[in-house]
Swiss-Prot record:
The lineage of its organism: Eukaryota, Sar, Alveolata, Apicomplexa, Aconoidasida. Belongs to the protein kinase superfamily. AGC Ser/Thr protein kinase family. cGMP subfamily. The cNMP-binding domains 1, 2 and 4 bind preferentially cGMP. The cNMP-binding domain 4 binds cGMP with the highest affinity and is highly selective for cGMP. The cNMP-binding domain 3 does not bind cGMP but is required for cGMP-dependent catalytic activity. The cNMP-binding domains 1, 2 and 4 can bind cAMP but with less affinity. It is a peripheral membrane protein. The active site is at D657 (proton acceptor). The keyword Disulfide bond does not apply. This is cGMP-dependent protein kinase. The gene is PKG. It holds the Pfam family Pkinase. Residues 825-846 have a biased composition (Acidic residues). ATP binds at I540, G541, R542, G543, T544, F545, G546, T547, V548, K563. Residues 1-22 are annotated as: Autoinhibitory segment.
Length: 846
């Protein structure tokens, strides 16, 4: 049985609207310059504050400067229980009483603070505070506090990133890789006279001076002074060797530091990454290798032989080369000779050998000689064989071309790798002469075609519509449906060559749940739906902003879900931008494990999202029926969620509210991620506190900026809930501040009945408080999670191809709500009323 049952958790979305508390504080605000003792008291209080626990002294001082002075008389109300809070206060003088439900529970004096939760978001006050005597407070508004945190965080990131750009060892890294390193920077403070590094010691840290000065000594002799922007120790990231100098802080000095261990976590071995980047870029410049898949290029980079050569060395000699087919210069310079005549010089990142890769039987006629000490990557016949398997170069490129074409089409896009490869192998080639009919309008078709060479004309009722050429395709619907062709395709060139596959072959490869899924998805997309054609059957769900109805399309009887969102609720809660963003993101989503939007409507009262109907109920309920999940069950659900979240992250979309309540199961038992009200397209970092408290990552709470890493944390919470039962942090808490406190400082523990070490290890690594150390947040992304030992026996390909048996398949239909149609009119009436004042042009895109 699942222990520690919990109620469904709701998302919160912080905003900084003007509140009654803001108005009240205006009456008590007085200008006063802070004395040194005031600043010290404020700093001490802030350091004990949950949200400020990770800030350095300079950041604490900056926040102290934004504190305002408030004066109260005995009996004055400061904050009121139940009202939305927006200020955090520190008592400067006097006594203040705390009341809960009109009962006095304690008194507070100088140095005490209250209202901490208001710094995080606009939650209701849990107590009333009144001045017992005349007194004064230092206070800061949430909007000011979080805006200051954002400003400090942005300034720090941008400054660190500019320093990273100046370090030559990072020159060949990508923008994403440099950002990874910037996020991994740790600030270290040194006092005057303090040693930063010592000559002869072995080190693994790179230091960049952010503030202050430092002196360089070699053999106790002063050599020079380093200023802001100088860096030292870069070789420590690459090599195990002693420091060549001693460096001592000359004045109070701040350094951004990067250690090799953390760098290996977020990026991998720096030298390997640098060389891999050079190889990948060189291969992508090759006429041959640019036609390889990304996976094949990675395999080549992994198997390439990297060697060091001295100056003036014959690396490859025309009479002695046997297996080498391609070379890439990683460091140094080489000279290329043909028939003993120099034909060019290759520098770092340059490559050579296309002709020998394309024709592997051709004898190597060139000579390659090093001009200075250099490092070369060599690709041999064996490397190519490991990468391509049994295929030759032409066959591999042909396979890749077909794959790139069919992956653009929804009917094939989400086939498993095995299904996709079987389909490609099933393609046959056929030729047509000029004027030949390839398919004829009105005939029932059974073949799908891709144009390999030549051009064809598309005609309908004898009228020419358009011309198709190489890599264009037609006839894909014939693989699923017995229906007449809607147009004719006629060979236009002297000779047209096409790849084709027959329906009978396709149906041997694609069967069962995947075939049913494709048929239903395409049928849904084919149907043109208008609002007046929909008939409501019942209410199947409800949320903060409205209801979800089960409707059917009267002309076709296809059933859909219709999410009805109240305009009044959206406007009153200032969520206009978020509902627009939800529509934009949902409309672009196209993944089998994410809810599919058909179209949107609007009227004077509501917005409407028409989506596919998902009938298997919520994952929240499913895991309660199943009890504690077995490892295979947890693998299935977590793996499915990972594929959906990975799809979003590839498009720079952070979901921000991942939890079992936001995942439905379809009639086959596979997952559907729903409700994109908290999602955001992200460039750089986001700062808004949004999501469900128990599932929030630490970086969301702290307010210093976050990215897609927050969804990885939520995966860890879900996995913990699947396997352990309760939530990992704040399980017994409803007070949001206490939930946040446990997320930031609580110990992660595991029940005695959970003994699988792979599961425990993955949960620990997903629930790492430092995002840069969290599995799935390195440059490898979700690959690290998929290759974790927890998924050691899991078949990702079968999951994608719907070839796994789900843990639970609903008997009949299950919905979060099931309200009879008679109550629907009452629900609709709640959305009606006089329009709210304000600009109504914001919803023109609906």
């Amino acid at each position: 049985m699942r222990c520690n049952e919990r109620n469904k958790k709701k998302a919160i979305f912080s905003n900084d609207d003007f509140s009654g508390e803001d108005t009240l504080m205006e009456d008590h605000l007085q200008l006063r310059e802070k004395l040194s003792e005031d600043i010290e008291m404020i700093k001490a209080s802030l350091k004990n504050n949950l949200v400020c626990s990770t800030l350095n002294d300079n950041e604490i001082l900056t926040l102290s400067n934004y504190m305002q002075f408030f004066v109260f008389k005995g009996g004055d109300l400061v904050i009121k229980q139940g009202e939305k809070g927006s200020y955090f206060f520190i008592i400067n003088s006097g006594k203040f009483d705390v009341y809960v439900n009109d009962k006095k529970v304690k008194s507070m004096g100088k140095g005490s603070s209250f209202g901490e939760a208001a710094l995080i978001h606009n939650t209701q006050r849990s107590a009333t505070i009144m001045a017992e005597t005349d007194g004064t407070l230092w206070g800061v508004q949430r909007s000011t506090f979080r805006a200051t945190l954002k400003q400090l965080s942005n300034r720090n990131f941008n400054e660190n990133r500019s320093f990273i750009d100046s370090v030559s060892v990072f020159d060949m890294l990508t923008e994403a890789q440099k950002n990874m390193i910037t996020n991994a920077c740790v600030i270290q403070m040194f006092k005057p006279g303090e040693t930063i590094v010592k000559q002869g010691d072995y080190g693994d840290v790179l230091f960049i001076l952010k503030e202050g000065k430092a002196t360089v000594f070699i053999n106790d002799k002063e050599i020079r002074v380093l200023n802001k922007g100088s860096y030292f120790g870069e070789r420590a990231l690459l090599y195990d060797e002693p420091r060549s100098a001693t460096i001592i802080a000359k004045e109070p000095t701040a350094c951004a530091s990067i250690c090799r261990k953390l760098l290996n976590i977020v990026l991998g071995n720096l030298q390997v990454v640098l060389f891999r980047n050079i190889m990948t870029e060189a291969l992508q410049q090759s006429e041959i290798f640019r036609q390889f898949s990304a996976e094949q290029l990675n395999d080549l980079a992994d198997t390439a032989i990297v060697r060091d050569y001295p100056a003036n060395y014959h690396i490859l000699h025309k009479d002695k080369v046997k297996s080498v087919k391609y070379l890439i210069v990683l460091e140094g310079k080489v000279e290329l000779f043909l028939d003993d005549e120099s034909i060019g010089i290759l520098t770092r990142g340059k490559s050579f050998g296309d002709q020998y890769v394309l024709n592997q039987k051709q004898k190597f006629r060139h000579t390659v000689k090093s001009l200075d000490v250099c490092k070369i990557a060599l690709i041999t016949e064996s490397c190519l064989a490991d990468c391509l398997g049994d295929n030759n170069i032409d066959a591999s490129i042909d396979h890749n071309n077909k794959k790139s074409i069919i992956k653009k089409m929804y009917i094939f896009r989400y086939l498993s790798e095995q299904q996709c490869n079987l389909l490609i192998e099933a393609f046959r080639t056929t030729r047509y002469e000029e004027g030949d009919y390839i398919i004829q309008e009105g005939e029932v078709g059974s073949r799908f075609y891709i144009i390999k060479n030549g051009e064809v004309e598309v005609t309908k009722n004898g009228k020419r519509l358009r011309t198709l050429g190489k890599n264009d395709y037609f006839g894909e619907r014939a693989l699923l449906y017995d229906e007449p062709r809607t147009a004719s395709i006629i060979s236009k060139a002297t000779s047209v060559e096409c790849w084709f596959v027959d329906k009978s072959v396709f149906l041997q490869i694609i069967q069962g749940p995947m075939l049913t899924h494709l048929e239903e998805r395409i049928k849904m997309q084919d149907t043109k739906v208008e609002m007046h054609e929909l008939e409501t059957e019942r209410i199947i769900g409800r949320g903060t902003f409205g209801t979800v109805k089960l409707v059917h399309h009267k002309p076709t009887q296809i059933r859909y879900a219709l999410k009805c969102v109240s305009k009044r609720s959206i406007i009153s809660l200032n969520q206009q931008n978020n509902i627009k963003l939800e529509r934009e993101i949902t409309a672009e989503n196209d993944h089998p494990f994410i809810i599919r939007l058909v179209r949107t409507f609007k009227d004077s009262n509501c917005f409407y999202f028409l989506t596919e109907l998902v009938t298997g109920g919520e994952l929240y309920d499913a895991i309660r029926k199943l009890g504690l999940l077995s490892k295979p069950q947890a693998q299935f659900y977590l793996g499915s969620i990972i594929l959906a979240i990975e799809y979003l992250h590839e498009r720079n979309i952070v979901y921000r509210d991942l939890k079992p309540e936001n995942i439905l199961l379809d009639k086959q038992g596979y997952v559907k991620l729903i409700d994109f009200g908290c999602a955001k397209k992200i460039q750089g970092r986001a700062y808004t506190l949004v999501g469900t408290p128990h599932y929030m990552a630490p970086e969301v709470i702290l307010g210093k900026g976050y990215g897609c890493t927050v969804d990885i944390w939520a995966l860890g919470v879900c996995l913990y809930e699947f396997i352990c039962g309760p939530l990992p942090f704040g399980n017994d808490q409803e007070d949001q501040l206490e939930i946040f406190r446990d997320i930031l400082t609580g110990q992660l523990t595991f029940p005695d009945y959970v003994s699988d070490q792979d599961s425990i290890n993955l949960m620990k690594r997903l629930l790492c408080r430092l995002p840069q150390g969290r599995i799935g947040c390195s440059i490898n992304g979700f690959k690290d999670i998929k290759e974790h030992a927890f998924f050691g026996n899991f078949n990702w390909d079968k999951l994608a191809g719907r070839l796994l048996e789900p843990p639970l398949v609903s008997k009949g239909e299950t919905y979060a709500e099931d309200i009879d149609i008679k109550q629907i009119e009452e629900e609709d009436a709640l959305n009606e009323g006089e329009p709210l004042d304000g600009d109504d042009s914001w919803d023109v895109d609906f």
